[in-house]
Amino acid sequence: MMPRRDVLFLSLLLVIATVSAVALADDEADCVYTFFLRTGSTFKAGTDSIISARVYDKYGDYIGIRNLEAWGGLMGPGYNYYERGNLDIFSGKAPCLPSPVCSLNLTSDGSGDHHGWYVNYVEVTTAGVHAKCSYQSFDVEQWLASDTSPYELSAVRNNCPVSLRESVGRVGSEIRKTLSWIV
């Protein structure tokens, strides 16, 4: 009878260990990312397009947000985002990056009646439990438009201490496998 009890006890321990490991894996540390976007005051600087963002750390790991407004628009119901002279604020949770945000890819989908958008700057803050808070400012000063110079719907700003090209080749990044686009 004793060996059967040992097998039952070991089986119970195995089940408890498995459940605990799964529970801990699902409890991945999240950070709160807040984006401050300033639209230029130039005539027709505002847009009705959907704006997405990717922020990278120095290793090339990233989080991506397909639609900033849907993900975490904080300006209230009925507010018209990305209008001339506005400072728009977006905030939401996503997995913490291994190091502070240092690069930005800001993209317009070019949709809507007024697709051109002039961006002054973007500021990104990050805060999380047991994670170091960080702040990064990106001077954009560029049109995101297909009919105005530089004729691009994306703006990339890299303030990283090392080249992202060198870092993207880093092997073994679990974050790159689990993150990609959030919304």
UniProtKB/Swiss-Prot annotation:
The record ties this protein, via Pfam families, to: PLAT (PF01477)
- Which cysteine pairs are covalently linked by disulfides here? none
Residue ranges annotated for the PLAT domain, each copy included: 31-158
Keywords (alphabetical) are: Endoplasmic reticulum, Signal, Stress response
Cell compartments where the protein resides: Endoplasmic reticulum
Q: What induces it?
A: Down-regulated by salt stress.
Q: Which GO terms describe its cellular component?
A: endoplasmic reticulum; secretory vesicle; thylakoid; vacuole
What is the annotated signal peptide range for this record? Answer: 1-25
Phenotype upon loss of function: No visible phenotype under normal growth conditions.
Q: Which domain of life is it from?
A: Eukaryota
Protein task: Involved in response to abiotic stress.
PANTHER family xref list? PLAT DOMAIN-CONTAINING PROTEIN, PLAT DOMAIN-CONTAINING PROTEIN 2
Protein's name according to its UniProt entry: PLAT domain-containing protein 2
**Which species does this protein come from?**
Arabidopsis thaliana (Mouse-ear cress)
Question: In the UniProt record, what gene is named as encoding this protein?
Answer: PLAT2
